[in-house]
UniProtKB/Swiss-Prot annotation:
Transmembrane stretches, start-end: none
Protein name per the record: Endoribonuclease YbeY
Gene name in the database record: ybeY
InterPro entries: MetalPrtase_cat_dom_sf_prd, YbeY, YbeY_CS
Cofactor (UniProt): Zn(2+)
Annotated EC: 3.1.-.-
Predominant location: cytoplasm
Organism: Mesorhizobium japonicum (strain LMG 29417 / CECT 9101 / MAFF 303099)
Length: 166
């Protein structure tokens, strides 16, 4: 069984605030375990060290659609959005607050069903994906997408979760 604390420094790299605001999600304690493991795995793969804070909001399609329209000009729900609190340059020091990751219940569940994977695995992947955005990664170009997906695959492999891109 993979260890829950993969950062190796005796504690989690970030103080995580979890909020279940809307939608049909697993219990909050289960979500907290998924998020903790996802964050530890992402930090282990990126080599980022230090301490920070992170907010993860579990919401629904209606809420994320509003956020997506307001912040990205896309009037439709999406699976995950990330909102950095401060600019973060890869290789730089962690800011005191990384930002917010927001997930949408209906979209996450629908995608997991379509891809025939456990919803917990999909949640874990999306938390890692959202966190990588907060850590300065993106997927606007093919090269960026390949680099980001490689980190996601490696972080998920640490947790014995199959490659979501296979």
């Amino acid at each position: 069984m993979p260890e829950d604390n993969l950062s190796g420094d005796g504690g989690p790299p970030v103080d995580i605030d979890i909020s279940v605001e809307a939608g049909d999600w697993p219990d909050e304690a289960g979500l907290a375990r998924l998020v903790d493991r996802a964050v530890d795995a992402a930090f282990a793969e990126t080599g980022v060290t230090g301490r920070s804070e992170l907010s993860v909001v579990f919401s629904d399609d209606a809420h994320i659609r509003t956020l997506n329209a307001e912040w990205r000009g896309k009037d439709k729900p999406t699976n995950v959005l990330s909102f950095p609190a401060f600019p973060f340059a890869q290789g730089g020091p962690l800011p005191p607050m990384l930002g917010d990751i927001v997930l949408a219940a209906e979209t996450v569940s629908r995608e997991a069903a379509l891809e025939d994977k456990p919803v917990q695995n999909h949640i874990t992947h999306l938390v890692i994906h959202g966190l990588l955005h907060l850590l300065g990664h993106d997927h606007e170009t093919d090269a960026e997408a390949e680099a980001m997906e490689a980190i996601e695959r490696a972080a998920l492999a640490r947790l014995a979760i199959p490659d979501p891109y296979a």
